[in-house]
Every structure is written in structure tokens, then in C-alpha cells.
């Protein structure tokens, strides 16, 4: 750290703060059983948008002396691409194949994490299924509860809602890459990265 240029050290420290804020929000949100969309979207932007994609891009742009226009374009791209990554993580956390993801089926339902997916579920599920949703994160939740809730969420269209959200953020990320300040070679690489982030299976 001591050998980093001051502006890079400052950016790194900002990333560390965002990391702590994101993890804190994750833990407190799960403990409080928060399901509101505002909290979930704020977490998605902090955890996935800021320090997973936008922050590292800012470090790279700063290291090579990128112009303010480059920084603005990369920040817009990073937030949208990062949120798309986070939303895909939420989909995989509910319906992902354990053999591919390496996590238990319905892992996010078992832990009761505060996610955009679960905030959407609050508006979509029937009263009986919504009762099952209240069990998320509780020790009393069984594998049968998880399976029932997975099916209820899918039937209610929550998966479709998530795919639309992911696509919207992918489109906004790609639109950010049309900025003339960005180099074509870098744009091509980021376009490929966007697809990997948004449509991965693990």
C-alpha cells in the first residue's frame, strides 16, 4: 500500500469501506428479515456494482491516467454490469444447480439474505406461499420448505422478473460502452465480460 500513488491508495480505501458497508448491510438485513426493495437494491449496487466491477475499473483507469470522461463511462458501465452480476447470483442462489454452483440448492432461501429477488417475491406470492417466505433464514426451514418455495417463486413469475431486470442492466451497461472516450479494444473486452457476468451458470 505504501508504494501506491496517493490517488490509487485513496480509491483502494474507498473500496474497502464499500466492502464493509455491503457485508454489514447483508448481515443486518438478514438478521432483521428485511425484504424491502430499496435496501436490496442498495446492497446490490454496493456489493456487486461498486466494489466488484466499478471500483476495479476505476483503479485501472486511474493507474493509466484515464480522462474524466473515461472514468464517467466506466463507472456507469461498472455499476450496471456489476448489478447484473449480483442479480444473476441471486437467481443461482435460488434455482442454481448445486453440482455447478458448489452451493446447496436454494442457499439464499436457507440463509434469508436480503435480495432483490426476495423483495420481488413479497409482491408476487400468494398468501400461503408468502407464509413460507417468512421462514427464510430460520433454523426451522426444511429442505421441503425450500423446494416448495422454489416452485412457488418460479410459478409466480419471479424468475421472469429477474431475467428482465438482468437484461435491462446489461443493456444499460452496453449503452455506457458507446461513449467515444473509450478505446474500441477495451470496449470489445468489456462487452464479452458483460455476457459472462450476466449469463453465467456458476
Residue ranges and their predicted role:
Residues 1-202:
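All-alpha prenyltransferase/terpene-synthase fold signal
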Amino acid at each position: 500500500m505504501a508504494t501506491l500513488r496517493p490517488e490509487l491508495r485513496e480509491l483502494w480505501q474507498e473500496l474497502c469501506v464499500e466492502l464493509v458497508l455491503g457485508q454489514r448491510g447483508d448481515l443486518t438485513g438478514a438478521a432483521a428479515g428485511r425484504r424491502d426493495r430499496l435496501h436490496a437494491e442498495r446492497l446490490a449496487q454496493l456489493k456487486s456494482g461498486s466494489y466488484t466491477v466499478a471500483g476495479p475499473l476505476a483503479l485501472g483507469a486511474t493507474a493509466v491516467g484515464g480522462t474524466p470522461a473515461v472514468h464517467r463511462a466506466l463507472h456507469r458501465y461498472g455499476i450496471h454490469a456489476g448489478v447484473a452480476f449480483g442479480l444473476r447470483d441471486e437467481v443461482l442462489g435460488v434455482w442454481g444447480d448445486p453440482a455447478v454452483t458448489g452451493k446447496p440448492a436454494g442457499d439464499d432461501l436457507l440463509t434469508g439474505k436480503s435480495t432483490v429477488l426476495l423483495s420481488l417475491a413479497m409482491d408476487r406470492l400468494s398468501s400461503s406461499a408468502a407464509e413460507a417466505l417468512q421462514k427464510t433464514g430460520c433454523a426451522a426451514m426444511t429442505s421441503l420448505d425450500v423446494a416448495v418455495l422454489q416452485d412457488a417463486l418460479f410459478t409466480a413469475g419471479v424468475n421472469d422478473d429477474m431475467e428482465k431486470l438482468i437484461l435491462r442492466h446489461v443493456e444499460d451497461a452496453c449503452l455506457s460502452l458507446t461513449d467515444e472516450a473509450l478505446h474500441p479494444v477495451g470496449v470489445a473486452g468489456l462487452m464479452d465480460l458483460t455476457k459472462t457476468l450476466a449469463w453465467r451458470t456458476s
